[in-house]
Amino acid sequence: MVVKFTKSEALHKEALEHIVGGVNSPSRSFKAVGGGAPIAMERGKGAYFWDVDGNKYIDYLAAYGPIITGHAHPHITKAITTAAENGVLYGTPTALEVKFAKMLKEAMPALDKVRFVNSGTEAVMTTIRVARAYTGRTKIMKFAGCYHGHSDLVLVAAGSGPSTLGTPDSAGVPQSIAQEVITVPFNNVETLKEALDKWGHEVAAILVEPIVGNFGIVEPKPGFLEKVNELVHEAGALVIYDEVITAFRFMYGGAQDLLGVTPDLTALGKVIGGGLPIGAYGGKKEIMEQVAPLGPAYQAGTMAGNPASMASGIACLEVLQQEGLYEKLDELGAMLEKGILEQAAKHNIDITLNRLKGALTVYFTTNTIEDYDAAQDTDGEMFGKFFKLMLQEGVNLAPSKYEAWFLTTEHTKEDIEYTIEAVGRAFAALADNK
């Protein structure tokens, strides 16, 4: 059991003097779980972390998804080391980027052409630009609660109803930009249709997380994505899948392969980098040929396609091609789900658990979670207490009630068994303090 965080606390105090908020991404702070110093990690191996105090954790954060093969996987580490020895950045084309592009195309047939960038945010941002260039329209649609990076156009909250335009969801986002975005509830065909009836002739594209990962793991209702394609295409707009979280997470071909629905454009990130910074986007040939140097939609990047990220991505996909890995993730996910639900029943703790294969979310509520409103209406205070109890048990989760638990190919049945026991102890403590 973890008993001290002395060095993490001291390091956070020092970080506050030099780094804004003491963290380089707000999701890493403990603000959403009652405050305190976030735990600073020193190294990772396989399914485990060790923090600066020497405490060991079973890791279900997986860096918010990218580390599907576990920390410091030897095949990926070797590829990165070799790339570094040969020079990490040239500013020229390389054989590695061609090889990696071919691998992505083979995995995801919707990608006629691809382009590499440096993050999921960049990938989504550029697909929007390309869609606007192709359609000659300006407005974008998105689903409430779905995160598509931190560019201005996607940091927009819903207006007062499905037929109203958005409002800025961050300081620094002009109202003029928010007016170009229509936000509708996920899994609700009627509100989507209502919005398209009013604004469809101005819409360039709709952004879709085909399986939601940003207010927990939420699957589309049967037929929902097919209806999205139908209605959006009838309006003359494009469908963009944000598969930054989902690609290569649930199966090798991404959510579009798992669900059997094809978008016009796809944004990728996270898993495809094997842990290094990366993004990519791609789609139909006639749409992608809008991108410079072939077309008028400009996008460039000094670090785009850098050899280290390309080598890491290739190695990661090579690991994921091994037979049985996704079946293992599903099996362990099912085992973890069953155990958590049994512990909740044993200790009379109200939860809803959403799981898809090797990813799940535990919500402190009895309600079904199918959209963002339902996810918001869950007990964040209870989650914060649970999070800190699990940290004391040596189990690392994301510090937010909205985030997923991600399994890696390196987790074992013994890890799952220990985690279930830890959940039981945490639930017992919560029950005692009701």
Curated annotation (Swiss-Prot):
Family indicated by similarity: Belongs to the class-III pyridoxal-phosphate-dependent aminotransferase family. HemL subfamily.
HAMAP family from the UniProt entry: HemL_aminotrans_3
Database matches in InterPro entries: 4pyrrol_synth_GluAld_NH2Trfase, Aminotrans_3, Aminotrans_3_PPA_site, PyrdxlP-dep_Trfase, PyrdxlP-dep_Trfase_major, PyrdxlP-dep_Trfase_small
Major place of residence: cytoplasm
Domain of life: Bacteria
Keyword Repeat (UniProt): no
Subunit structure: Homodimer.
GO cellular component: cytoplasm
Pfam families, per the entry: Aminotran_3
Protein's recorded name: Glutamate-1-semialdehyde 2,1-aminomutase 1
Catalytic activity field: (S)-4-amino-5-oxopentanoate = 5-aminolevulinate
Pathway involvement of the protein, from the record: Porphyrin-containing compound metabolism; protoporphyrin-IX biosynthesis; 5-aminolevulinate from L-glutamyl-tRNA(Glu): step 2/2
